[in-house]
């Protein structure tokens, strides 16, 4: 369906629900590509909030993740797609975090927060046309950790999803891990 044979974070979300009794799971995906597999897994499920920040689907594979895709049936309103035009950068992403992502998470009050941490939205990555810096990845991570501290006892799981410029990937992962630690 997408870049991955298995949607690792979607599998983890369902595992946490079925095996550990977690009720409400939030998934935030900031990979440059829309998380179509995760969205498909939960689009009719109100127990999982899925938020994807990605490049405009008219300009980037897989061609899904329009802002009008909000979930189906009982899951309507539990999918938030935030597509960005080519050339968008830190300012646009951080504004979306503050104005859309964090308020949606605060309203949902997850019991655990899962991050699909793709770093191919970095400005040096060759695969797409989003211009994020490693500092932006760190700030987004810190904001997500603060949400987890407020609502789920700091429970956050992050899974590496993508990044194709190894230098930019390395710097971004380091900044993300620092953000995960709250420093």
What would you call each of these model-derived segments?
Residues 1-143, 177-178:
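Conserved alpha-helical scaffold segments that buttress catalytic/binding sites
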Residues 122-125, 165-169:
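Short active-site-adjacent structural elements
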Residues 133-134, 167-183:
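Short, electropositive alpha-helical surface patch
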Residues 143-149:
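Flexible, low-complexity linker/loop segments at domain and module junctions
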């Amino acid at each position: 369906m997408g870049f991955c044979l298995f949607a690792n974070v979607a599998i983890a979300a369902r595992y946490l629900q079925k095996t550990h009794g977690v009720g409400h799971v939030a998934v935030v995906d900031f990979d440059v590509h829309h998380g179509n597999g995760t969205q498909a897994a939960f689009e009719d499920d109100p127990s999982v909030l899925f938020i994807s920040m990605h490049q405009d689907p008219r300009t980037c594979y897989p061609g899904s993740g329009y802002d009008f895709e909000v979930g189906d049936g009982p899951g309507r309103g539990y999918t938030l797609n935030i597509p960005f035009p080519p050339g968008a950068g830190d300012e646009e992403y951080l504004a979306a975090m503050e104005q859309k992502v964090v308020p949606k998470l605060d309203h949902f009050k997850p019991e655990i927060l899962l991050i699909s941490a793709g770093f191919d939205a970095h400005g040096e990555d060759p695969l797409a046309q989003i211009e994020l810096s490693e500092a932006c990845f760190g700030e987004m991570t810190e904001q997500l950790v603060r949400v987890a501290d407020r609502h789920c006892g700091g429970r956050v799981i992050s899974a590496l999803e993508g990044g194709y410029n190894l230098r930019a990937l390395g710097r971004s992962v380091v900044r993300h891990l620092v953000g995960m630690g709250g420093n």
